[in-house]
Amino acid sequence: MQFVSTRPQPQQLGIQGLGLDSGSWSWAQALPPEEVCHQEPALRGEMAEGMPPMQAQEWDMDARRPMPFQFPPFPDRAPVFPDRMMREPQLPTAEISLWTVVAAIQAVERKVDAQASQLLNLEGRTGTAEKKLADCEKTAVEFGNHMESKWAVLGTLLQEYGLLQRRLENLENLLRNRNFWVLRLPPGSKGEAPKVPVTFVDIAVYFSEDEWKNLDEWQKELYNNLVKENYKTLMSLDAEGSVPKPDAPVQAEPREEPCVWEQRHPEEREIPMDPEAGAEPLVPAQDASSQVKREDTLCVRGQRGLEERAIPTESITDSPISAQDLLSRIKQEEHQCVWDQQDLADRDIPTDPNSESLISAHDILSWIKQEEQPYPWGPRDSMDGELGLDSGPSDSLLMVKNPPPAPPQPQPQPQPPQPQLQSQPQPQSLPPIAVAENPGGPPSRGLLDDGFQVLPGERGSGEAPPGGDRSTGGGGGDGGGGGGGAEAGTGAGGGCGSCCPGGLRRSLLLHGARSKPYSCPECGKSFGVRKSLIIHHRSHTKERPYECAECEKSFNCHSGLIRHQMTHRGERPYKCSECEKTYSRKEHLQNHQRLHTGERPFQCALCGKSFIRKQNLLKHQRIHTGERPYTCGECGKSFRYKESLKDHLRVHSGGPGPGAPRQLPPPPERD
């Protein structure tokens, strides 16, 4: 290997002139540092070719002899160039090690960052899992509380079921013994005595046999529909829970009942109680009447429709039936009642035989079957005697007493054949049950000569009819005086002349018009029954006597409280058979079922448009009549719908106007 150098000799550079010893100079020192760094790798590469490793590291000075210039020998000092060449290869190794350490440190830092991010992610997931676990625990606690409430309701239902079974057994035993009924008024929720007794007479309608024959077919159909409607509303009484405790007896007041269309002699006013015997023991008329007419409370009927019981209504006339048939019919009605034994002597029964009047068995059935709900009739002249509708934990009491035996009396004269009830054949016709009226003095409700009665609310002030100072027991022959009856009915102010001597109740059936004798003195709205007027009057007085024990929400009627309590218990007893939806009220289910059947029974007579609900028809009719019943109290502007008035009131109150979105009302078929 030969090196050709173009550099000047040390003598040319003036080494001696610089004062440098020639023995200490090397050619590598004469080069700039940067050239030495660049040429050293090349030199090392050339030296490594064809030489062993050890020989490449040692410099053989003899190998340089062919070179054009040679360094002068320096015997006293080792050459610098070979030593420098041996030390230089160690520097890249140190540099490579430093960069490796830095790269390793950076890799470790990146791994630490990745582990830190994963740790943060795990912490977040742990927090989410803890929240879900807390929600699950809360849900489990709520579910446990819900199950406890359901178990409590189930226990209450089982207890009530046991009570109903015992009442039914008592009823069957009493009916088997052929006892009779005395209805009683239920006490209040706190056990207080009721204020006013109530009878079935206020909603009953009576016809004689001849008048029934003179009625047209549509009038008879109207009568049947009224009876069915009353009976259907009666089925909902069991949900009222208006049943007092048996240990809370209530004294009843004597009430007057309507007389029948035939007046009989006192010796004929008895009814045989045992049709199997020829000479049967007879019951005094006043005893039977005292047990029938003191109807102070309600009997809770079983929830069965009129169609299922096949009770005929079109053939019900004033035909008398035996007490046994009457009791068997009552038993078929499956009335679930609680009986309370009370001494007959404690009831102040009138004993004057001259104060008796006759009433047919049909009238008794009418009183029993047409009772809708606890009607707060109160006194006839005012609303002060409002019926307390607060109900206790048990059902209505029905007082039962065996009629005491009476002294033998002559057999009643045979009656002409009369049509019988269709529910069961009548082997014989017996005289009507005798009922006593108020002894000594004119009756508080006028009785007409033809046997019809002016019902409460049809006379206005409740006074006796003109010339009506005669008693019901005497002075009237068989049939009475028709002219006097017409005069009394006209003078009462509730009838429509000689065609309707019975007053507004008779006019309802003869002319098909619904009478509403009870008017509100404040707003003038009329009602057909006194109870509706009393409940309506509470809207003016802001009276809400029925309060929920759970949420303290109050209501103005007892039925509203009962429906509200069903929401606490989660009761939805009415279920659609097609879509399985359930409802808490029967009318909501009926409206919903019309969606399946497509029935729209309420049709506008002017434009022919039909509706599912009656309320929608009434709202629609305001378009034709121009009625705007909702008036703003601030600006006097009137509106057709209540929702429009609410939107308008928001303008006065500073809330969102009519254009603002509002929450949609629930579907019509839901609660």
Swiss-Prot record:
Subcellular location(s) of the protein: Nucleus
Boundaries of every KRAB domain copy: 198-271
Glycyl lysine isopeptide (Lys-Gly) (interchain with G-Cter in SUMO2) crosslink, residue number(s): 293
Skewed-composition ranges (Low complexity): 385-398
Source domain of life: Eukaryota
Gly residues biased stretches: 470-486
Protein family membership: Belongs to the krueppel C2H2-type zinc-finger protein family.
Protein name (Swiss-Prot/TrEMBL): Zinc finger protein 282
Biological classification of the source: Eukaryota, Metazoa, Chordata, Craniata, Vertebrata
Gene: ZNF282
